[in-house]
Amino acid sequence: MIKMTVYELSKNSQFNVLTMPEPERETDGVYIGDLLSWVMGRARENNVWITIMSNINVVAVASLSDVSCVVLAEDVTLDSDVLATAEQKGINVLSTPLSAYDAAVLLSGM
């Protein structure tokens, strides 16, 4: 994956912006995981975190892990109150119809 901003990543037609309070945040690598405690200990700063989890804890884990953005795979969405919290905490959230695997493959080629 070439380093790029979240804004640049979002320009790919496979990604939909749900909230992007920090569009200039740099990306560096990808982490795929749904077990939140596992993600907290393994996702790295500026990673793109791909998940199918869809609750408020996603925002907390993204903040603690300092990922550049969360990508919700398989058209998963977040409730409006969760998106508002993500916006407030500076967490970029995108969605994609792709599976987590296919999203990671796409990102690896960007």
What is each stretch, according to the model?
Residues 1-42, 93, 102:
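Conserved catalytic and cofactor-binding micro-motifs
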